[in-house]
Amino acid sequence: MTSSETTTDHPRTGKCPIDHSKFARSNEANPDAYINGIKKDQQSSSWWNSLWSRNTDVASEPDVAMLHKKPSTVDTHDHPLANPPPGCPMHKASNENSTGFFSNLFGREKQNSEATPAVQPPATCPMSNSNQKPAGVSEVLTGVDSKQQSYVPEGCPVATPKRGWFNWFGNNDDQKQEAYEVDKSNMMYKNIPQTAVDDQVVGLETTRTTSSIPKVDGKNWEYPSPQQMYNAMWRKGYRDSGENVPIMVQVHNFLNEGAWSEIKAWEREAGENTEPKLLRFEGNANKRTPRALWYMMLGRINPNRWGSGEGPFDRHDWYVQRKDNSIVRYVIDYYEAPDSADGKPVFSLDVRPAVDSFESVALRWKHWRAMRQMQQQ
């Protein structure tokens, strides 16, 4: 999301444009007016439009701030829900002593793999796969009493059976079975268990939330339920009580929706009425993009301007199908930015079309030139 308050080009810097305190106040005044962070009397599209449009008075905002910094002349609208917190199967901590939002949220370390063999979870959610810091997973959660767990659903559009931390489309209720039935058309698992695992302490919701992200079959992708999230984590060897899982789901959904909003902004630049739909997605946290490597190098040279140089905590590739059936691959790097002034976690997404075709290269060049012109004004 390109914020009018952002002063640099790097995706890790800038201020969060969301007034988080306003949501908390409005929700305290009328706690029954929201479901999973969305007003009951508002349509999803209009809510997201107001949330992510510039200079718009926001009626409800997430507790987790997300800063999208994409060099673009197009404002990002309709930012709905989207990555996962510590201990989350979508991101694996490479440093046991790492700190930050995700690590604090899901603080316990993984049990010894010899004592409890980790089972490979499915993969299909836009926020999966990572051998970096643990990442947060969730849509837009806020204003909900932590004792009441506000749960968000499943079916997230990102990850792959090969590399994903969890695929929200598995087809097996046996939690100890590693094999899942895969849909060959999109390489996604068909289903994933909703049953509680052995020794699970906290009861988790099994309801799934429908995203704003369209599929090629005319339906919309669905996000994972808290129980499915926990099951995926359990397969990877995490043994937390599960009380933080609902928040993970919300962060995850929140970031995914933001990523899709950025993609739609790019598609508007590509031409009118491309009618983009998410065909499939991959989690490629272990594959650094040239752009991410460049930012990491700049961060080590000048951390005050470019951040710490740690690099993104996750990377996804989303395959978007247009109405003419052409397919465009988008690359998304997920960064954890410094917390906001009031202590809220802030995330930055660097979303852009991959340089797979001359058209994508031309689009990025056009985008870069427009951004430079705006900076010079």
Curated annotation (Swiss-Prot):
UniProt entry tagged with the keyword Iron: yes
Enzyme Commission number(s) of this protein: 4.4.1.17
Record has Metal-binding as a keyword: yes
Feature: compositional bias, Basic and acidic residues: 7-22
Entry GO terms, CC: mitochondrial inner membrane; mitochondrial intermembrane space; mitochondrion
Disulfide bonds, paired cysteine numbers: none
HRM repeats: 114-119, 124-129
GO terms, biological process: cytochrome c biosynthetic process; mitochondrion organization
Compartment list: Mitochondrion inner membrane; Mitochondrion intermembrane space
EC class name: lyase
GO molecular function: holocytochrome-c synthase activity; metal ion binding
PROSITE patterns in alphabetical order: CYTO_HEME_LYASE_1, CYTO_HEME_LYASE_2
The entry's keywords: Heme, Iron, Lyase, Membrane, Metal-binding, Mitochondrion, Mitochondrion inner membrane, Repeat
Chain spans, region Disordered: 1-29, 111-136
Catalytic reactions on record: holo-[cytochrome c] = apo-[cytochrome c] + heme b
Main location: mitochondrion
Listed Pfam families: Cyto_heme_lyase
Family, similarity comment: Belongs to the cytochrome c-type heme lyase family.
Function: Lyase that catalyzes the covalent linking of the heme group to the cytochrome C apoprotein to produce the mature functional cytochrome.
Name of this protein: Putative holocytochrome-c synthase
Origin species: Schizosaccharomyces pombe (strain 972 / ATCC 24843)
